[in-house]
Amino acid sequence: KLHAEGHDVIVERYEGAYDVVVPVLGGDDPILLSTMRFEMPGDEGNFRSYEEKRGLSEGPKERLVAMRNPVMTRKIREFTRAMLPELWPFDYGRFEFRYTPTTGEVLFMEVNLSCNLWSKKTVSGAAQLAGLTHQQLLEHIAAYSMDRQGVIKAERTPFAPTVMPEEVGGEMIEV
């Protein structure tokens, strides 16, 4: 019906799963930030409409939550690390998965390099949990990118999160 009405849509199988994201920053080595998932308040199936995903609707807002399940977090991060050699180097990106808690199934969705850096989305939210302000995140990305491409010679200061990703399970950011 939506296609017939002229709308651009992507149709996906409904899994009752969570969208899970591993944000990665560039550096001397890839910097994996906290594994994050989106959840909708009051929706056990975690279904998000297009309007909700884009912040275009009134009502409950989705939350960005650091994953609590250490076994699943480790598994998803291992999948991410396995893909890095194919794409490295890059400035920043996110690796997206679907995680079904009832079965433990993890499905790869996509890699999005140079993705949205809006202050209320995954890369910025995970950076915030690691102790970076949005300004510091943008500064890190710009300096690393220009240095990597030979535009400037940046003084490299190792990125040292104030909180390690495995320590933030369950912390939440309203988006």
Predicted ranges, named:
Residues 1-78, 102-107:
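Phosphate-binding site of ATP-dependent enzymes
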